[in-house]
Amino acid sequence: MNLNATLIGELIAFTVFVLFCMKFVWPPLNGAIEARQKKIEDGLAASDRAEKDLELAQKKAAEQLKDAKVQAADIIDQAKKRAVLIVDEETVRGQQEREKIIAQGHSEIESERNRVTEELRKQVATLAVVGAQRILEREINQAAHSDIVEKLVAEL
């Protein structure tokens, strides 16, 4: 056996093997590797997008929470102002009602006082007439006259 022929045979066999591998084995392996690389890149890109979306959603949620707190504070402030306004209105209305009741009371008292005064005047007039009748029935006597006047004063 000749060493050169063996080496040339091995070189030809190796070249055929390499060409066969490059033609039939390497493209599917290379395609699988590229597909895997693309899948990994897509996964990383999706992960980055998801991370950005999560960050954006967290910012949006924080902003909405902040807005909700501001709105809640505004609603509470408006409710407090409305409560103060209602209390003030009711206080004014209560004072007006009190003044009205007091005025009615004064009016009723004045009316009752006028009625009692008128009644007393009528009684005094009646007593004066009765006293005058008694005086006229008796003879005009100083002692009897004094006695009748004292009785009238006692009745008044």
UniProtKB/Swiss-Prot annotation:
How does it sit in the bilayer? Single-pass membrane protein
Annotated organism of origin: Pseudoalteromonas translucida (strain TAC 125)
Task: Recite the UniProt keywords alphabetically.
Answer: ATP synthesis, Cell inner membrane, Cell membrane, CF(0), Hydrogen ion transport, Ion transport, Membrane, Transmembrane, Transmembrane helix, Transport
Q: Which residue ranges does UniProt annotate as crossing the membrane?
A: 7-27
**Which Pfam families does the record cross-reference, listed alphabetically?**
ATP-synt_B
Q: Where in the cell is it found?
A: Cell inner membrane
Gene3D superfamilies documented for this protein = 6.10.250.1580
InterPro entries, alphabetized: ATP_synth_B-like_membr_sf (IPR028987), ATP_synth_b/b'su_bac/chlpt (IPR002146), ATP_synth_F0_bsu_bac (IPR005864), ATP_synthase_B_chain (IPR050059)
Q: What is this protein called?
A: ATP synthase subunit b
Q: Which family does it belong to?
A: Belongs to the ATPase B chain family.
